[in-house]
């Protein structure tokens, strides 16, 4: 039944042969079609093209299996097969020599000789990788070499090639080593210059702002005492009125006579003097008296100085108000 269907579908060009394996082209999946067809060509009845697709059988020669595909439409034969030698693994045929330390076979190590070859190849790869990187060596200079180098550096920081070569001959160094030394020496010199400028700025700042302006813990009570002493020693009428409790020096004694304008003449005069006298005189007199007693008022900070003067003025105002109320 199958043969009848094939004979109707295809026209056989040659007689079929038995005992041959046929597989589809290499581009698709290997699929077993028929076992009884061998070396035949098929013509498609439905296809309008006259191109003939011929499939050669699998040929076996010298234990090789080759899969080929040919097309009668073209003159060239395209080989899509992979040669395989029976009795050997496939990866031994696929291995090819590769450069850059990749020439390693895929087969396992069979003996000590092959293992030694692999070790030698690995050592060679390591040596090639390490040699590609530049190794940096630290040069130890002697005292004579440093002396010669410093002499030239004092003259010029940027010696030319001729000077570097002459210096290299005298110091028994290479010109590259001399050049590197001058680069490092210039960097060190610039660093010292920056550090010196910073220190100079710090010293200038310390000289401008003296340390003596710092506050003293024992200066406030002494300054306050000096202020009171200065007020007592000054010859102003107002300070002499405020310091003592006795009001005889400030106003006339209170008389039980009827109130007259002449009874308050002394108090009114002193009050007029106090009203016309500026408050800055209190602070000025206290500063002068404090300076003459040996403690300069400039040693106090600005904030503490202001607070002390305000406190003194408030205390004086309270005493003056109390004296006025007692006199009334």
Curated annotation (Swiss-Prot):
Alphabetical list of SMART domains matching this protein: HOX
Documented effect of changing residue 112 to L: Associated with P haplotype
DNA-binding region: 134-193
Region of interest (Transactivation domain), residue spans: 194-328
Localization in the cell: Nucleus
Transcription among keywords: yes
Subunit field text: Binds DNA as a homodimer; required for transcriptional activation.
Organism phylogeny: Eukaryota, Metazoa, Chordata, Craniata, Vertebrata
Subcellular location, principal: nucleus
GO molecular-function terms, A-Z: DNA-binding transcription activator activity, RNA polymerase II-specific; RNA polymerase II transcription regulatory region sequence-specific DNA binding
Domains as described in the record: The OAR motif may negatively regulate DNA-binding and therefore transcriptional activity. It is found in the C-terminal transactivation domain that stimulates transcription.
Family membership: Belongs to the paired homeobox family.
Keywords: Activator, Developmental protein, DNA-binding, Homeobox, Nucleus, Repressor, Transcription, Transcription regulation
Motif (OAR): 308-321
Alphabetized Pfam families for the sequence: Homeodomain, OAR
Role noted for this protein: Sequence-specific DNA-binding transcription factor that binds palindromic sequences within promoters and may activate or repress the transcription of a subset of genes. Most probably regulates the expression of genes involved in the development of mesenchyme-derived craniofacial structures. May therefore play a role in beak development and regulate beak shape.
Organism, as annotated: Geospiza fortis (Medium ground-finch)
Protein name, UniProt field: ALX homeobox protein 1
Keyword Kinase found: no
């Amino acid at each position: 039944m199958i043969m009848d269907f094939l004979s109707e579908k295809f026209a056989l060009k040659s007689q079929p042969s038995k005992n041959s394996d046929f597989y589809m082209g290499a581009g698709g999946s290997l699929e077993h079609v028929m076992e009884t067809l061998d070396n035949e060509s098929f013509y498609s009845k439905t296809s309008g093209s006259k191109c003939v697709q011929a499939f050669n059988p699998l040929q076996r020669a010298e234990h090789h299996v080759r899969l080929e595909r040919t097309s009668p439409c073209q003159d060239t034969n395209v080989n899509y097969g992979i040669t395989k030698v029976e009795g050997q693994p496939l990866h031994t045929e696929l291995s090819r020599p590769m450069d850059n330390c990749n020439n390693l076979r895929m087969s396992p190590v069979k003996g000590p000789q092959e293992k030694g070859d692999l070790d030698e190849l690995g050592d060679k790869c390591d040596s090639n990788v390490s040699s590609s990187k530049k190794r940096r060596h630290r040069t130890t200079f002697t005292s004579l070499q440093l002396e010669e180098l410093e002499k030239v550096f004092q003259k010029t920081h940027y010696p030319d090639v001729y000077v570097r070569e002459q210096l290299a001959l005298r110091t028994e160094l290479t010109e590259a080593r001399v050049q590197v030394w001058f680069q490092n020496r210039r960097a060190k010199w610039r660093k010292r210059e920056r550090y010196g400028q910073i220190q100079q700025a710090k010293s200038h700042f310390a000289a401008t702002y003296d340390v003596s302006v710092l506050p003293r813990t024992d200066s406030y009570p002494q300054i306050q005492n000096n202020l009171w002493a200065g007020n007592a020693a000054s010859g102003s009428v107002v300070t002499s009125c405020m310091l003592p409790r006795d009001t005889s020096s400030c106003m006339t004694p209170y008389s039980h006579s009827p109130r007259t304008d002449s009874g308050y003449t002394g108090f009114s005069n002193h009050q007029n003097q106090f009203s016309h006298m500026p408050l800055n005189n209190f602070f000025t007199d206290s500063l002068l008296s404090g300076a003459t007693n040996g403690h300069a008022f400039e040693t106090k900070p600005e904030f503490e100085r202001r607070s002390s003067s305000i406190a003194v003025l408030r205390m004086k105002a309270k005493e003056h108000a109390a004296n006025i109320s007692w006199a009334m």
